[in-house]
Regions:
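Active-site acidic/histidine proton-transfer and metal-coordination neighborhood
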Residues: 1-61
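Histidine-acidic metal/acid-base catalytic patches
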Residues: 18, 44-159
Length: 159
């Protein structure tokens, strides 16, 4: 939705998020937002703007690199991953790990290690900047869980 990517939409999002973060501060909990290409917070830069505008340790980031990709920017995935750790690294609370393949004009989410995401780079950045961050496996089912776990462990050990 193009309207999601406007500055007006971002400012509306920030103003509506402020009271939610204040509530999180009062209860001593963390709230995390997940940048997604199709949503208002659709880039690493916009996520940084939200964090700076709210300025609270109780607001953090769920980083899902696949969700920041689209067919128009997949050739820049390394830049996006690097930028995420540069601009958001301290505030990344969780990393969602999945992969993607291109089907037509869309990205299809699949299990980590079975698609085109640069996992050596992602896991190297995690190891360097957030070695104890929680990572969740998405698009993993009983049939691929063991292989996905093995892929993640071997790749992490190799970087």
């Amino acid at each position: 939705e193009p309207a999601n990517h406007t500055e007006e939409a971002l400012q509306t999002f920030i103003e509506n998020l402020r009271p939610i973060v204040k509530c999180a501060e009062q209860f001593g909990v963390i709230i995390a937002i997940e940048p997604v290409w199709k949503h208002i917070v659709c880039t690493v830069e916009r996520a940084r703007k939200v964090l700076d505008a709210i300025d609270s340790p109780n607001l953090q980031i769920i980083f899902d690199p696949v969700n920041l990709l689209c067919v128009d920017n997949i050739d820049r995935q390394d830049e996006i991953i690097n930028q995420a750790f540069e601009l958001l690294g301290d505030e990344i609370a969780v990393v969602h790990c999945k992969d993607y393949v291109v089907e037509g004009n869309e990205l299809k989410s699949i299990a980590a290690g079975t698609g085109s995401l640069n996992y050596p780079l992602l896991l190297k950045k995690i190891k360097e900047h957030k070695p104890y961050v929680h990572c969740t496996l998405e698009n993993t089912v009983p049939e691929n869980a063991a292989a996905t776990k093995e892929f993640m462990e071997k790749t992490y050990a190799s970087v």
